[in-house]
Amino acid sequence: MAQRILTLILLLCSTSAFAGLFDAPGRSQFVPADQAFSFDFQQNQHDLNLSWQVKDGYYLYRKQISITPSQAEIAEVRLPAGVWHEDEFYGKSEIYRKRLNIPLIVNQAASGATLTVTYQGCADAGFCYPPETKTVPLSEVSASTVAKSTPSPVAAQTEETPQPAARLPFSALWALLIGIGIAFTPCVLPMYPLISGIVLGGKQRLSTGRALLLTFIYVQGMALTYTALGLVVAAAGLQFQAALQHPYVLIGLALVFTLLALSMFGLFTLQLPSSLQTRLTLMSNRQQGGSPGGVFVMGAIAGLICSPCTTAPLSAILLYIAQSGNMWLGGGTLYLYALGMGLPLILITVFGNRLLPKSGPWMEHVKTAFGFVILALPVFLLERVIGDEWGLRLWSLLGVAFFGWAFITSLHARRSGMRIVQIILLAAALVSVRPLQDWAFGATTAQTQAHLNFKPITTVDALNQALAEAKGKPIMLDLYADWCVACKEFEKYTFSDPQVQQTLGDTVLLQANVTANNAQDVALLRHLNVLGLPTILFFDAQGHEHPNARVTGFMDATTFSAHLRDRQP
């Protein structure tokens, strides 16, 4: 009896094994969207909780979640912070794994009110789902008791999402380095001996400990001003984040930072009005140097006097803080920025002017280099408006300008070993110019032929017509969307391969762009029984699909070529 049971188990296992062995390599192993992202909601009067159970190996994009009420009014939606995910085409994005809860406050809802919830996610294996839309029916509630119930969800959300502070170390490190770099610009460095003497109250003989204490207090006073500024901007940034998505705002900010960068190049001077600077200077002069209280006030006032060299970098940091809307990030980043500016002052005060580099043209070079750093911000902002292709050309132009300037500047250096640096800078400039060269003179023949010539279709009727017009040739239908990372990988790495192109030489190539996910896109996907993208379908000469040849998920050129050969008669 035991032997028969064992034999039966072995038969079942072998059946499963052979089924997997002969399973088509392109067959979908992905679950439907409702199983990958199980959505649910609960409403208790004014409290509404939206929840997702995310399957292992899948994730939701934070930026793709939208919540729109109909015949109802809800409090401001604050999405929890996610974890960072990075890919080649979209850079860094925040995503949610495992479980996501979004508590909401329904201020009031009429009879028949609804909430439209849209979300979109992908699988780690390289498969993305179209945006899903769910309609949440709301119970009728009045606005009478909303004031009492409003604070609880915000508090709960704050407890669940302490993660933004975790991003502080990397950002703070850059702020610290920028502060140190600003200290060596021509507007700041020559002032340090004078500031050092004022801080010490003109007393030349002070113990090292006393001098260190007074200078540190001065720097803390300066840091207090910057930290307060960071907190204010971060608080205002909570309302600023939505505005940053508007093209006109992005273009306006790009123009502002371009002007700030030009000020770093010396085209004009940007500083506080002279009357205000004079008042602040007089207030600072009334303080008594050499005393902790007076030194602290002097430092706080000094933080208000923005020199021409500090205005542009400070504005760039403030934009970053405003975009984050994070109070800890805002205060901490500017505190360390001020600390970076103060470190050289502490060293000079304690160890004397012998540590101070000699003034010279190199300080102007530092200021100009910061101008190029500031110019990166307009490119970053405009890239969201003009798209990746033109964004790459702007980055290319900025790279050529920076490396070209650095190369020309290095020609005046007389130090040994600069020849190697010059070669590296020249090579970097030549590499940076490539996208501009392709744009101005056209890509090479090989590059021009690097993409397959797809015929676009948009509807089920257009697909049926294209299948009828194939004239006895096999057909390949590629389903594409801009939000599909693996679709872009197919374009760059698979469809550009000469072997793949040669194999598809006699195949009619169709492509449906379902980025908009509108009604006709949804109808097409439903007609083809497609769960998500990338999905590639193959039809025979009679217009019938080969179901076992369907591809879901990314394939590299070698694997895809083998798949194409296997489906050939």
Swiss-Prot record:
* Origin: domain of life: Bacteria
Q: Does the keyword Transmembrane helix apply?
A: yes
Tell me what organism the protein belongs to.
Citrobacter koseri (strain ATCC BAA-895 / CDC 4225-83 / SGSC4696)
Q: Name one Pfam family in it.
A: Thioredoxin_7
Paired cysteines (S-S) = C122-C128, C187-C309, C484-C487
Name the chain's protein. Thiol:disulfide interchange protein DsbD
Catalyzed reactions per annotation: [protein]-dithiol + NAD(+) = [protein]-disulfide + NADH + H(+); [protein]-dithiol + NADP(+) = [protein]-disulfide + NADPH + H(+)
User: Where primarily located?
Assistant: membrane
Record keyword Oxidoreductase present: yes
Report membrane topology: Multi-pass membrane protein
Annotated membrane-spanning segments are 168-188, 213-233, 248-268, 301-321, 328-348, 362-382, 391-411
Q: Where is the Thioredoxin domain?
A: 430-569
Q: One GO biological process from the UniProt record?
A: cell redox homeostasis
Secretion signal, residue range per the UniProt entry: 1-19
Q: Which GO terms describe its cellular component?
A: plasma membrane
The entry's family comment says: Belongs to the thioredoxin family. DsbD subfamily.
Under the GO molecular function aspect, what terms does this record hold? electron transfer activity; protein-disulfide reductase [NAD(P)H] activity
User: What Enzyme Commission number(s) appear in the record?
Assistant: 1.8.1.8
Job description of the protein? Required to facilitate the formation of correct disulfide bonds in some periplasmic proteins and for the assembly of the periplasmic c-type cytochromes. Acts by transferring electrons from cytoplasmic thioredoxin to the periplasm. This transfer involves a cascade of disulfide bond formation and reduction steps.
